[in-house]
């Protein structure tokens, strides 16, 4: 908490006159703590400050080394504070804090795109899509790029890779990121990757499908998992082959050998049973990776959907981006 408070204290204060009753770092401290507790509106922040008034003042006294004698700030106070806040300065402060946490808890970076369906497009070319780099370990967005069309996602992924530090980290991207240039960039920056393969890479997909057959059964490592909750039972079976390029002479690869630092290939079979509807669905997907640990790949593929379940859900439902 000391670290985030010190960084929030660097945000410039735009307020003037009688609007300076409450220090800006105190208002930001309440807002940050409130958001982490599920409070999202100005009225929510006022309520949160009232509910935890003594604790917040004691925390502020410990962090800022000064005491507050005022009553709790109103919703108008929070509104005025944030209306004039420099978004770039606030974003830079947040990134500074995020990087300190990222060095400790970062390793898995999920990259995924999202359409902001609730935006009112005054211009057909206005930016209504985002591509985000999300740190699964701390449930926070590391960086994002806004684009006007979903077809520009590939370039947006490349742009993200230019600005984020991927060294020593593992990147998971869906099929849109399975491009030779993207893999080359990840490897050149000393990162690892797990990428989904679909029909946008037909040659690679065909060669992957040909490997998971009885001919290679002795080479296949199987990792299984089961989860139950929300009225569903999901089973996952990951079949993995390590160092597939050792079969290059017999297979005469045309596509598989173009992926830099390829160490493993994977077939994931997911079965989901809906207890209420009594319906079972089956999905098969393929992946390429620079990792050689099947259990780790299985876990990271599962964790990749944290960007959908945690980030996108919050943006859509709590912040109303799809309204």
What feature does the model see in each segment?
Residues 198-302:
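An anionic, glycine-rich sequence signature occurring as long contiguous blocks
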Residues 291-323:
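Short amphipathic alpha-helical "interface-anchor" segments enriched in bulky aromatics
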Residues 194-196, 286-288, 310, 314:
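Short, conserved beta-strand edge motifs with alternating hydrophobic and charged residues
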Residues 2, 7-10, 17-181:
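Conserved, well-structured functional cores that handle cations and Mg-NTP chemistry
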Residues 26, 283, 311:
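Catalytic-loop motifs flanking and including active-site residues across diverse enzymes
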Residues 140-218, 222-231:
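Nuclease catalytic cores that cleave nucleic-acid phosphodiester bonds
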Residues 93-96, 221-224, 311-317:
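Short coil/turn segments at secondary-structure boundaries
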């Amino acid at each position: 908490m000391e670290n985030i408070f010190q960084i929030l204290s660097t945000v410039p204060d735009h307020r003037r006159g009688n609007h300076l009753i409450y220090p800006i770092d105190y208002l930001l401290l309440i807002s940050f703590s409130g958001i982490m507790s599920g409070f999202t509106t100005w009225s929510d922040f006022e309520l949160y400050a009232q509910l935890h008034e003594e604790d917040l003042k004691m925390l502020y006294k410990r962090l800022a080394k000064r005491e507050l004698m005022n009553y709790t700030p109103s919703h108008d106070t929070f509104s005025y504070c944030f209306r004039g806040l420099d978004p770039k300065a606030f974003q830079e402060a947040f990134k500074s804090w995020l990087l300190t946490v990222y060095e400790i808890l970062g390793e898995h970076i999920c990259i995924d795109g999202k359409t902001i369906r609730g935006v009112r497009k005054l211009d057909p070319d206005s930016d209504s899509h985002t591509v985000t780099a999300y740190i699964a370990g701390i449930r926070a967005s590391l960086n994002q790029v806004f684009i006007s069309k979903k077809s520009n996602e590939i370039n947006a992924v490349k742009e993200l890779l230019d600005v984020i530090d991927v060294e020593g980290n593992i990147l998971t991207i869906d099929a849109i990121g399975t491009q030779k240039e993207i893999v080359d960039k990840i490897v050149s920056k000393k990162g690892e990757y797990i990428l989904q393969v679909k029909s946008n890479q037909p040659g690679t997909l065909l060669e992957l499908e040909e490997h998971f057959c009885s001919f290679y059964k002795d080479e296949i490592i199987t990792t299984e998992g089961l989860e139950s909750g929300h009225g569903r039972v999901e089973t996952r079976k990951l079949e993995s082959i390590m160092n597939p390029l050792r079969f290059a002479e017999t297979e005469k690869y045309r596509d598989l050998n173009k992926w830099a630092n390829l160490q493993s290939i994977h077939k994931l079979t997911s079965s989901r049973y809906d207890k209420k509807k009594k319906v079972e669905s089956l999905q098969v997907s393929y992946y390429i990776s620079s990792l050689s640990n099947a259990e780790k790949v299985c876990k990271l593929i599962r964790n990749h959907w944290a960007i959908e379940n945690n980030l996108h859900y919050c943006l859509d439902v709590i912040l109303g981006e799809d309204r």
